């Protein structure tokens, strides 16, 4: 059937595809092709063909849509990474695991206890220290050093069978320390009241100071302090007036009236200097002393250690001019 003879049929929507037939030879040797053979056009029923074609198209479109969706999902999943779930550390399970590991290590290597310590401390291996054993010479040197330190410590205890000096009965010469110890021992025997290493305190009544008017000060218990110090009032009065740089006198009530304003602290400081210089012994610091005057010098004699030493004479200090200079010059002339 040629192309000119083909008639357009509007009822036909689609034509079936022609099946290709293989090239066949007839018995006569004439080759027949599909074009030479007369083909009868069969009218296709419209209804069944249209339904089949529509269904086929729908299936193809569904498959394409499904494949497109799968591709989109795969692409989306590649972009999104899954979050790793954090494993919760269980202490009980870890302890059980450590115990199991301990048991296995004990069974396999019972002679190495360091592996157990490594497991307990988070697999941290300790460095092995090389233990050095000291020699006998080092031990002897340490013992001698300890003995020297013990001998240096003075605990007041000494063990000796000797009653006399340490050098007695031997040809060796005595040392300075031995002589010094002998001197202190003799002092303790002669003076049992004295205790070596302790300072004797001199206790005295505080001075009573009263303000008299606006320009004078009264030392109330002056005579009582003179009796406690075993000193003459004239000597103490001269020292007080010289140190304070003023003038004063003793009234009828045996009170020292000093010209000027003075506080109790100032008089206490003056009395402390007087006691240190003219009362206490310069050798043993004992207050049991006697002040004697020989020719023009004063001597301090101790009744405890029987020492005798000279003391400085009282000198008047600087005195400021308080009155009018014209009146002083007139009196002098």
Swiss-Prot record:
<dbReference type="GO" id="GO:0002183">
    <property type="term" value="P:cytoplasmic translational initiation"/>
</dbReference>
<keyword id="KW-0597">Phosphoprotein</keyword>
<dbReference type="GO" id="GO:0001731">
    <property type="term" value="P:formation of translation preinitiation complex"/>
</dbReference>
<feature type="compositionally biased region" description="Acidic residues">
    <location>
        <begin position="139"/>
        <end position="149"/>
    </location>
</feature>
<dbReference type="GO" id="GO:0005829">
    <property type="term" value="C:cytosol"/>
</dbReference>
<dbReference type="GO" id="GO:0003729">
    <property type="term" value="F:mRNA binding"/>
</dbReference>
<feature type="zinc finger region" description="C4-type">
    <location>
        <begin position="281"/>
        <end position="305"/>
    </location>
</feature>
<feature type="region of interest" description="Disordered">
    <location>
        <begin position="1"/>
        <end position="120"/>
    </location>
</feature>
<keyword id="KW-0479">Metal-binding</keyword>
<keyword id="KW-1017">Isopeptide bond</keyword>
<comment type="subunit">
    <text>Eukaryotic translation initiation factor 2 eIF2 is a heterotrimeric complex composed of an alpha (EIF2S1), a beta (EIF2S2) and a gamma (EIF2S3) chain. eIF2 is member of the 43S pre-initiation complex (43S PIC). eIF2 forms a complex with at least CELF1/CUGBP1, CALR, CALR3, EIF2S1, EIF2S2, HSP90B1 and HSPA5. Interacts with BZW2/5MP1. Interacts with EIF5.</text>
</comment>
<feature type="compositionally biased region" description="Basic and acidic residues">
    <location>
        <begin position="96"/>
        <end position="105"/>
    </location>
</feature>
<feature type="modified residue" description="Phosphoserine; by PKC; in vitro">
    <location>
        <position position="13"/>
    </location>
</feature>
<keyword id="KW-0396">Initiation factor</keyword>
<feature type="compositionally biased region" description="Basic and acidic residues">
    <location>
        <begin position="40"/>
        <end position="51"/>
    </location>
</feature>
<feature type="modified residue" description="N6-acetyllysine">
    <location>
        <position position="293"/>
    </location>
</feature>
<keyword id="KW-0007">Acetylation</keyword>
<comment type="function">
    <text>Component of the eIF2 complex that functions in the early steps of protein synthesis by forming a ternary complex with GTP and initiator tRNA. This complex binds to a 40S ribosomal subunit, followed by mRNA binding to form the 43S pre-initiation complex (43S PIC). Junction of the 60S ribosomal subunit to form the 80S initiation complex is preceded by hydrolysis of the GTP bound to eIF2 and release of an eIF2-GDP binary complex. In order for eIF2 to recycle and catalyze another round of initiation, the GDP bound to eIF2 must exchange with GTP by way of a reaction catalyzed by eIF2B.</text>
</comment>
<feature type="compositionally biased region" description="Acidic residues">
    <location>
        <begin position="106"/>
        <end position="118"/>
    </location>
</feature>
<keyword id="KW-0862">Zinc</keyword>
<protein>
    <recommendedName>
        <fullName>Eukaryotic translation initiation factor 2 subunit 2</fullName>
    </recommendedName>
</protein>
<feature type="modified residue" description="Phosphoserine">
    <location>
        <position position="158"/>
    </location>
</feature>
<dbReference type="GO" id="GO:0031369">
    <property type="term" value="F:translation initiation factor binding"/>
</dbReference>
<dbReference type="Pfam" id="PF01873">
    <property type="entry name" value="eIF-5_eIF-2B"/>
</dbReference>
<dbReference type="GO" id="GO:0003743">
    <property type="term" value="F:translation initiation factor activity"/>
</dbReference>
<feature type="modified residue" description="Phosphoserine; by CK2">
    <location>
        <position position="67"/>
    </location>
</feature>
<keyword id="KW-0863">Zinc-finger</keyword>
<feature type="cross-link" description="Glycyl lysine isopeptide (Lys-Gly) (interchain with G-Cter in SUMO2)">
    <location>
        <position position="102"/>
    </location>
</feature>
<feature type="compositionally biased region" description="Basic residues">
    <location>
        <begin position="13"/>
        <end position="22"/>
    </location>
</feature>
<dbReference type="InterPro" id="IPR045196">
    <property type="entry name" value="IF2/IF5"/>
</dbReference>
<dbReference type="GO" id="GO:0005850">
    <property type="term" value="C:eukaryotic translation initiation factor 2 complex"/>
</dbReference>
<keyword id="KW-0832">Ubl conjugation</keyword>
<comment type="similarity">
    <text>Belongs to the eIF-2-beta/eIF-5 family.</text>
</comment>
<feature type="region of interest" description="Disordered">
    <location>
        <begin position="139"/>
        <end position="165"/>
    </location>
</feature>
<keyword id="KW-0648">Protein biosynthesis</keyword>
<keyword id="KW-0963">Cytoplasm</keyword>
<dbReference type="InterPro" id="IPR002735">
    <property type="entry name" value="Transl_init_fac_IF2/IF5_dom"/>
</dbReference>
<feature type="modified residue" description="Phosphoserine">
    <location>
        <position position="2"/>
    </location>
</feature>
<feature type="modified residue" description="Phosphoserine; by PKA; in vitro">
    <location>
        <position position="218"/>
    </location>
</feature>
<dbReference type="InterPro" id="IPR016190">
    <property type="entry name" value="Transl_init_fac_IF2/IF5_Zn-bd"/>
</dbReference>
<dbReference type="GO" id="GO:0008584">
    <property type="term" value="P:male gonad development"/>
</dbReference>
<dbReference type="GO" id="GO:0002176">
    <property type="term" value="P:male germ cell proliferation"/>
</dbReference>
């Amino acid at each position: 059937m040629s192309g000119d003879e083909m008639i357009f049929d509007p009822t036909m929507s689609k034509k079936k595809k022609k099946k290709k037939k293989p090239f066949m030879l007839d018995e006569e040797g004439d080759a027949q092709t599909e074009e030479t053979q007369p083909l009868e056009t069969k009218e296709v029923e419209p209804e069944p063909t249209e339904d089949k074609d529509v269904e086929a198209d729908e299936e193809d479109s569904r498959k394409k849509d499904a494949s497109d969706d799968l591709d989109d999902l795969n692409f989306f999943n590649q972009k999104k990474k899954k979050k790793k779930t954090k494993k919760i550390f269980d202490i009980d399970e870890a302890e059980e695991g450590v115990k199991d590991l301990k048991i296995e290590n004990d069974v396999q290597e019972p002679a190495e206890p360091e592996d157990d310590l490594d497991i307990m401390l988070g697999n941290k291996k300790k460095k092995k220290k090389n233990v050095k054993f000291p020699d006998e010479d080092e031990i002897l040197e340490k013992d001698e050093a300890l003995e020297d330190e013990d001998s240096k410590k003075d605990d007041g205890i000494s063990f000796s069978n000797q009653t006399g000096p340490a050098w007695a009965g031997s040809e060796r010469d005595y040392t300075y320390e031995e002589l010094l110890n002998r001197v202190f021992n003799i002092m303790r025997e002669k003076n049992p009241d004295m205790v070596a290493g302790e300072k004797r305190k001199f206790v005295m009544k505080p001075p009573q100071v009263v303000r008299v008017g606006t320009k004078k000060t009264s030392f109330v218990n002056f005579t009582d302090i003179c009796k406690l110090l075993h000193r003459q009032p004239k000597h103490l009065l001269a020292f007080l007036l010289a140190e304070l740089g003023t003038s004063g006198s003793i009234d009828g009530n045996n009170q020292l009236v000093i010209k000027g304003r003075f506080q109790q602290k100032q008089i206490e400081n003056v009395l402390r200097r007087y006691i240190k210089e003219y009362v206490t012994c310069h050798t043993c610091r004992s207050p049991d002393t006697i002040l004697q005057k020989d020719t023009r010098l004063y001597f301090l004699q101790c009744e405890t250690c029987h020492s005798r030493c000279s003391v400085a004479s009282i000198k008047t200090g600087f005195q400021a001019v308080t009155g009018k200079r014209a009146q002083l010059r007139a009196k002098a002339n």
